Regions:
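Loop-rich catalytic cores of soluble enzymes, especially ATP-dependent carboxylate-amine ligases
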Residues: 131-268
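Terminal catalytic/cofactor-binding subdomain
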Residues: 1-159, 168
Length: 268
């Protein structure tokens, strides 16, 4: 394998540029899964666990299973969409690239119906909130993914609420195309400038462990004490000379969690 140079990474940003007529949007939609009889969050193993849920989803909908140490940790279909697993068993739809929000709405609706059809057989249900409203950190179940074990050990070293972020939060994210470096900068700056407004508009997590938390968005509060090396608003984004190279320089100075070699996550 040839040595990777800085310019190779900048070229990767350049390779993502697309003409306006080819622009797409991609949505990531997370939700908590719980047992209907007890409202407890669902663990990976055992009866009506996340493993059984993923395997049934794959069988009934002809999705391909993605395995790690013989455990099903994600699914994907022929369109480019996937269902992945967050640290505490939150399920995430990573939608395929689509042309508009109407298509995204349809995709999400079909996904939720697919989920409900299988969950009803297992006595499970789901809810889309920014923060688990009922259960404590110690009540959560860790999913059997190698990189989460590394992050689990790292998070307490850099913040007080990183494990809560991993186990007790959900979100909806959007991925956008860009046609040039300047277009990327423009979209990046606007999205960061509007982040607080978006948080206020869609705040829906006022409870922690069954009590009012004092926040309309407990999820947003958690991110203030997670890992300052990779959270918050990077001031560099609003620099007059901000672009691919300066963003890359910022990324390269962020401490790494791990590297991935020959199918394994290696703690560094």
């Amino acid at each position: 394998m040839s040595k990777l140079e800085k310019n190779d990474l900048i070229d990767w940003f350049v390779s993502g540029e697309k003409p306006r007529e080819d622009w797409k949007i991609g949505t990531e939609h997370e939700k908590f899964v719980f047992h209907e009889d007890s409202f407890k969050r669902v663990g990976y193993f055992g009866k009506s666990g996340i493993s059984e849920l993923l395997n049934k989803l794959a069988e009934k909908n002809n999705w391909e299973k993605i395995l790690e140490n013989n455990n099903t940790i994600a699914l994907r279909d022929h369109t480019g969409a996937s269902i992945s697993l967050e640290p505490g068993g939150q399920l995430e739809l990573s939608g395929k690239p689509l042309e508009n929000l109407h298509q995204t709405c349809k995709e999400t609706g079909l996904h939720l119906k697919m989920m409900k059809d299988v969950m009803s057989e297992l006595g499970l249900s789901m809810i889309g909130l920014g923060y688990d409203p009922k259960w404590s950190r110690s009540d959560q179940n860790w999913m059997p993914k190698g990189r989460y074990e590394i992050m689990k050990n790292y998070m307490p070293k850099v913040g007080n609420l990183g494990l809560d972020m991993m186990l007790r939060t959900c979100t909806i994210q959007v991925n956008l195309d860009y046609f040039s470096e300047q277009d990327m900068v423009h979209k990046f700056q606007i999205s960061l400038a509007l982040q607080s407004v978006a948080t206020a508009l869609f705040a829906n997590s006022p409870f922690i462990e069954g009590q009012a938390s004092g926040y309309l968005s407990s999820r947003a509060m958690v991110w203030t004490d997670t890992d300052s090396d990779r959270t918050g608003v990077p001031g560099i984004v609003f620099d007059p000379n901000f672009g691919y190279e300066s963003w890359l320089n910022y990324i390269l100075q962020v401490p790494m969690y791990f590297i991935y070699r020959e199918g394994k996550y290696i703690d560094i």
